[in-house]
Amino acid sequence: MPNHLRTYLVDHAALTLAVLELAKRARNSNPGGELGGFLTGIIPTLEAERKTLKEMLRRIKGSDSPLKNFAAWGAEKAGRFKLNDSLFSYSDLSRVVELEALLAATEVKTAMWDALATLAMTRSDFRDLDLGGYLRKNKTMGEKLRAFHRTAAHRALRTEEP
């Protein structure tokens, strides 16, 4: 019989690894300033999310997948090769693309924490985990990412008036 919960947790643990790597890359490309501070601030939350997913796996007698983790890690690294009108340096468009990827991942993680928080209400082995806290943090994270994205997109995509 398939263990859908295990597969779900393994897949999302791999996703959180990719998101964590992307957040670190974006932070390193945007040191200082409000965006850099925000990205620095979300990294501990992303690390805690990953740790919680791994703990949930442990509780259901599952384990992390090195193959899926490697694939997620590799996908994030491969994403660095997207050309953004600047072959060897970071561009304003790079920032927009990174923020869009973080936004998309945050939307997925928001849905995940919602599903897991709902599940935890019916499972005694998960009740002590603050899954609703992660849900709230991801909603807030998404709102802030949208604001940073709006500013970055305006800067990168504006054109001179004719």
Set out the residue ranges of the language-model regions.
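Carboxylate-rich helix-loop segments that flank metal/cofactor sites and access channels
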Residues: I60-D92
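Alpha-helical scaffold segments that form or flank carboxylate-/histidine-based iron centers
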Residues: H4-H12, G33-E55, E98-L102, R127-N138
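Inter-helical turn/loop segments and adjacent helix faces that build the functional surface
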Residues: R25-G37, I60-K61, L116-G132
